[in-house]
UniProtKB/Swiss-Prot annotation:
Its main location: cytoplasm. Component of the acetyl coenzyme A carboxylase (ACC) complex. First, biotin carboxylase catalyzes the carboxylation of biotin on its carrier protein (BCCP) and then the CO(2) group is transferred by the carboxyltransferase to acetyl-CoA to form malonyl-CoA. One of its GO terms (molecular function) is ATP binding. Its EC number is 2.1.3.15. It comes from Rhodopseudomonas palustris (strain BisA53). It is found in: Cytoplasm. Pathway: Lipid metabolism; malonyl-CoA biosynthesis; malonyl-CoA from acetyl-CoA: step 1/1. This is Acetyl-coenzyme A carboxylase carboxyl transferase subunit alpha. HAMAP family: AcetylCoA_CT_alpha.
């Protein structure tokens, strides 16, 4: 789990100052000072400031929130939503990739296959999970698990949180592009319902490889894009400092993507972002996932494939 000490983003400085003042006053109150009324006033002011700030986030600020180090990760959602989770390892071709977690468990009493990118929350775990950037063996593991889920009639849940597939030389030598394509194809071929939730970053093919789903949900302050704002600004303007401008131009927010029909639902985050109340966010995501699976439960295998195929064809026709 992330460090319980709250971390503030640069644009949250006014809120950080108020929270610091509140902490100081609470310390004084613990020493016997009668300042409860003053504390209440500043807490109300801090809450109002946080509400106002998060009601008008820019796309670049949402990018920062999506990357917040204390935002709940894939492992947190699995821990909060999946019981009897049994992770499976390896692609049966090259090796294991811990950037992409996959396994089977129970979601609200029903067996389910779970896939998700895990970024890690400390130096050690970030290195272990390669910062959530999967290699070819990660996507081939995903294909293996999706094929197992299809064989046994189990729905698939994908938790998306990656800056993108790993671009290293070794990954390219082992067929990164082909692995992503095969994983996307496996999603499209599934005869069981699949639901994807973009919980943080949805970066390019690395995300779509497990998010080509019947239903795509997205957290309010998550992002979903073909390339990072920093990389886009470097390519388009030869200047990485234009990342804020790129973020706006690329239409990467949940609000933009819902309007374009790329996603199906926005999950409202707690005031101040998912990291301020992880338990509430995970519970809300669980309810939305359950409803999505219920909505698809009446469809047979052919109808499930047809609905998914038509969904992505419609996106291409609308935005192409």
């Amino acid at each position: 789990m992330p460090d319980p000490m709250r971390s503030y983003l640069d644009f949250e400085k006014p809120v950080a100052e108020l929270d610091s003042k509140i902490d100081e006053l609470h310390a004084l109150a613990a020493g016997g000072s009668n300042i409860g009324e003053e504390i209440a006033k500043i807490e109300e002011k801090a809450l109002a400031a946080l509400t106002e700030l998060y009601a008008a986030l820019t796309p670049w600020q949402k990018t920062q929130v999506a990357r917040h180090p204390q935002r709940p990760h894939c492992v947190d959602y699995i821990e909060g939503l999946i019981t009897e989770f049994t992770p499976l390892a390896g692609d049966r071709k090259f090796g294991e990739d811990e950037a992409l977690i996959g396994g089977f468990g129970r979601f609200r009493g029903e067996s389910v296959c779970v896939l998700g990118q895990e970024k890690g929350f400390s130096t050690e775990t970030r290195l272990k999970h390669n910062f959530g950037m999967a290699r070819p063996e990660g996507y081939r593991k995903a294909v293996r698990l999706m094929e197992m889920a299809d064989r046994f009639g189990l729905p698939v849940l994908s938790l998306v949180d990656t800056a993108g597939a790993y671009p290293g030389i070794g990954a390219e030598e082992r067929g990164q592009a082909e692995a992503i394509a095969r994983s996307t194809e496996a999603c499209l071929k599934l005869g069981v319902p699949n639901v994807a939730v973009v919980i943080g970053e949805g970066g390019s093919g690395g995300a779509i490889a497990i998010a080509t789903a019947n239903k795509v949900l997205m957290l309010e302050h998550a992002i979903y894009s073909v390339i990072s704002p920093e990389a886009a600004s470097s390519i388009l303007w030869r200047d990485s400092s234009k990342a804020q401008e790129a973020a706006t131009s690329m239409k990467i927010t949940a609000q933009d993507l819902l309007r374009f029909g790329v996603i199906d639902q926005i999950l409202t985050e707690p005031r101040g972002g998912a990291h301020r109340d992880s338990a509430a966010m995970i519970a809300k995501a669980g309810d939305a996932i359950a409803k999505s699976f219920a909505d698809l439960s009446s469809l047979d295998s052919d109808a499930i494939r047809a609905q998914r195929r038509q969904k992505f064809l419609d996106i291409g026709r609308k935005l192409g």
